[in-house]
């Protein structure tokens, strides 16, 4: 009811109004006479979904009766139910709801598969999906293990988005107008002028996402005076520097919430309309290590339009489950199916010099099977040590370039007081040996194949054999002997 509504998220738009005893809605102006009409939140959703259904029907040339719907990752079951109810009134049967970041990642992986990079979509990787919208931003850190997605953490900011960047442009344009037209007054104090500036600022921001220059051009901004202002991208990026830094901090905070380091992130997938902004991707590129791939239109020409990623993912999911019975779909999304045990630590083998090679990464849903091959250049007997490992961040000081004691003319004493640059790298170490297995008489230059199977009860079976050889070694380690796991 209205008493449970938090109106703070609406401060920049229409404010909710109490309808009837406890209903929630808005007052809108409709028709040529702009008569005020009360309309409930449900009716707003119904009208919107009807419009979407009709647009889809016009494009496909046939009626649309069911759909997969994407929702924010912080949607409650009550909110999902309310949206499904509104969809039903709009003539749509919602066969499944999926979270927007998962839908976006599904669309991205499907494109990799379609482009011939199918194996890439199945790699074990940590993906951060940053959904940067017009009025809010949402982050999800997802572990992709063999094509199965596990959400490790989510973060939400209801104040950070494209409109935040628009405000920077509005402030700049208003000040520039007032400098030259003081007698006309400050346009920020006139509601109609603010509306014109807001509309134009959004257009300028979008133009600066694809070009180096854009211009404000507003007829009769205030007191009948027209206004034009050229805005170079460099000027825009300087003005909005603090906002761009906020996006980077927000994304890094989500990584920390997942109890990870930025070195753990393999891919950052930018989605949402504001992701078109080149400076956001550039800042992430400089802040994250070179091993992290940033997927955005500005640095990846083949990237899918970020405004369409989530909806493409929903369409792909719909095509996958459209032939299933509704009861089967519902049963497959029950907690007993979706909440499964995961490995808490990586499992791998201990190599020479106590180096640890990961075979089954942390946060892998089980049951799971992984295989690795170990080269044996010298041949002979080989000892395989299966262990549970741990990830550490190793920090070292970068060596300064040798100068032979000779200073350049530009060098100062202050430079010598600067701290050495830190070099951070991710290393894996053995934490607990789970089992040992020996392979005798491996040929010189041969390979040993190690297959690790983690069962649903977190027991581990190990199979070792020489590639091309006969026989092998196999065994099972019960969970009680040292395996750690967690349900997610």
Label each PLM-derived region with a short phrase.
Residues 1-9, 17, 32-38, 57-488:
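Oxyanion-binding/catalytic loops of NTP- or PPi-dependent enzymes
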Residues 21-26, 305:
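Intrinsically disordered, low-complexity, Ser/Thr/Glu/Asp/Lys/Arg-enriched terminal regions and linkers
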Residues 26-30, 36, 43:
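Glycine- and Gly-Pro-enriched alpha-helical subdomains that act as flexible
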Residues 46:
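Membrane-embedded glycan transfer/ligation machinery
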């Amino acid at each position: 009811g209205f008493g449970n509504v938090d109106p703070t998220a609406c401060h920049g738009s229409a404010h909710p109004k109490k309808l009837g005893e406890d209903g929630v809605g808005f007052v809108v102006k409709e028709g040529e006479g702009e008569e005020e009409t009360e309309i409930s939140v449900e009716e707003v959703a119904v009208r919107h979904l009807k419009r979407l259904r009709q647009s889809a029907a016009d494009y496909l040339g046939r009626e649309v009766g069911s759909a997969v719907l994407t929702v924010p990752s912080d949607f409650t079951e009550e909110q999902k139910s309310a949206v499904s109810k509104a969809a039903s009134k709009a003539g749509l049967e919602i066969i499944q709801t999926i979270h927007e970041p998962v839908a976006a990642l599904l669309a991205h992986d499907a494109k990799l598969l379609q482009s011939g990079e199918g194996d890439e979509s199945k790699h074990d990787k940590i993906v951060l999906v940053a959904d940067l919208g017009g009025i809010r931003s949402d982050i999800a850190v997802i572990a992709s293990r063999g094509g199965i997605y596990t959400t490790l953490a989510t973060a939400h900011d209801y104040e950070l988005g494209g409109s935040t960047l628009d405000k920077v442009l509005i402030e700049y344009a208003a000040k520039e107008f007032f400098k030259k037209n003081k007698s006309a007054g400050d346009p920020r104090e006139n509601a109609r002028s603010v509306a014109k500036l807001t509309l134009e600022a959004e257009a300028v921001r979008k133009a600066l996402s694809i070009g180096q220059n854009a211009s404000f051009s507003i007829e009769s901004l205030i007191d009948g005076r027209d206004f034009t202002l050229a805005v170079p991208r460099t000027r825009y990026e300087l003005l909005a520097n603090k906002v761009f830094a906020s996006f980077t901090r927000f994304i890094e905070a989500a990584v920390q919430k997942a109890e990870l380091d930025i070195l753990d992130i393999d891919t950052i997938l930018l989605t949402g309309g504001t992701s078109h902004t080149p400076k956001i991707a550039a800042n992430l590129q400089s802040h994250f290590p070179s091993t992290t791939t940033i997927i955005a239109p500005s640095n990846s020409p083949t990237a899918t339009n970020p405004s369409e990623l989530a909806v493409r993912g929903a369409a792909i999911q719909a095509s996958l489950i459209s032939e299933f019975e509704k009861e089967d779909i519902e049963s497959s999304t029950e907690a007993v199916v979706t909440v499964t045990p995961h490995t808490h630590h990586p499992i791998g083998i201990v190599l020479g010099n106590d180096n640890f090679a990961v075979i089954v990464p942390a946060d892998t849903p089980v049951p799971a099977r992984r295989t690795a091959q170990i080269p044996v250049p010298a041949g002979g007997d080989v000892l395989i040590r299966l262990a549970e490992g741990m990830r550490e961040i190793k920090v070292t000081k970068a060596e300064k370039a040798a100068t032979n004691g000779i200073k350049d003319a530009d060098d100062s004493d202050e430079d010598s007081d600067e701290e050495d640059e830190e070099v951070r790298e991710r290393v894996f170490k053995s934490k607990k040996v789970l089992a040992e297995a020996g392979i005798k008489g491996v040929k010189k230059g041969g390979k040993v194949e190690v297959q690790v199977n983690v069962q649903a009860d977190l027991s581990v079976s190990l199979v070792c054999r020489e590639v091309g050889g006969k026989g092998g070694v196999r065994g099972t380690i019960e969970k009680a002997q040292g395996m750690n796991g967690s349900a997610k």
